[in-house]
Amino acid sequence: MRHPVVMGNWKLNGSKEMVVELLNGLNAELEGVTGVDVAVAPPALFVDLAERTLTEAGSAIILGAQNTDLNNSGAFTGDMSPAMLKEFGATHIIIGHSERREYHNESDEFVAKKFAFLKENGLTPVLCIGESEAQNEAGETVAVCARQIDAVINTQGVDALNGAIIAYEPIWAIGTGKAATAEDAQRIHAQIRAHIAEKSEEVAKNVVIQYGGSVKPENAAAYFAQPDIDGALVGGAALDAKSFAAIAKAAAEAKA
């Protein structure tokens, strides 16, 4: 039985004050809510403060991060390692986000190496996949997603997906206000799962596949009502405690 995961990607947003206010607000909003794992990925500089804030509150919120390097130490200016993230309690690490693929020229192969290194270090990769608007219009959505997943499967085996999370985020829906319909998202999720099932039905059945791309309280329930959508990777709405908590509650209710 897959357990829903709702994760907030704060991207390049926040301040010390915002971190404390948002996390304390989330703790209050989520009191008594069960049946969903809730995670947050603040900017790297705020991971320490987020850990302290969550620990002091005795919070069940999972701490994550937005990136990792391929090394645990060395002459790699500006990077952060899985070992460092572990020391601060971060467990769920986003990799392959379209913004990093585009702005930092991260290839499928490079993302797959990050995936392997996170697994080697006992952390949970949150593997982002998704197509551009042009690829969507050309009918290439499933082929693009399959290629991005196969970069992992072909180098590490399908069992590497056990315990990992896949986040399907159509690039044209990220931060644009446009969102795939729940039915369209379900169709793609089902095809992603079917692609994995070609290698292992057991892995496909158990892997969590989130939807991301303009998820809001108003549309969350429709997504989570779909059988192959196991949660959400949330951007803008994750910066507001009430909105993000409402999305998490919708997941808990839909998957109960």
UniProtKB/Swiss-Prot annotation:
Primary localization: cytoplasm
Q: Which residues form the active site?
A: 97 (electrophile), 169 (proton acceptor)
The UniProt annotation places substrate binding at 9-11, 175, 214, 235-236
Question: Biological process GO annotation list?
Answer: gluconeogenesis; glyceraldehyde-3-phosphate biosynthetic process; glycerol catabolic process; glycolytic process
Pathway connected to this protein = Carbohydrate biosynthesis; gluconeogenesis; Carbohydrate degradation; glycolysis; D-glyceraldehyde 3-phosphate from glycerone phosphate: step 1/1
Family annotation (InterPro entries): Aldolase_TIM, TIM_sf, TrioseP_Isoase_bac/euk, Triosephosphate_isomerase, Triosephosphate_isomerase_AS
Keyword Ubl conjugation assigned: no
**Which residue pairs form cystines in this protein?**
none
The EC number(s) attached to this protein equal: 5.3.1.1
> What name is this protein filed under?
Triosephosphate isomerase
**Protein source organism:** Aliivibrio fischeri (strain ATCC 700601 / ES114) (Vibrio fischeri)
Q: What is the lineage of its organism?
A: Bacteria, Pseudomonadati, Pseudomonadota, Gammaproteobacteria, Vibrionales
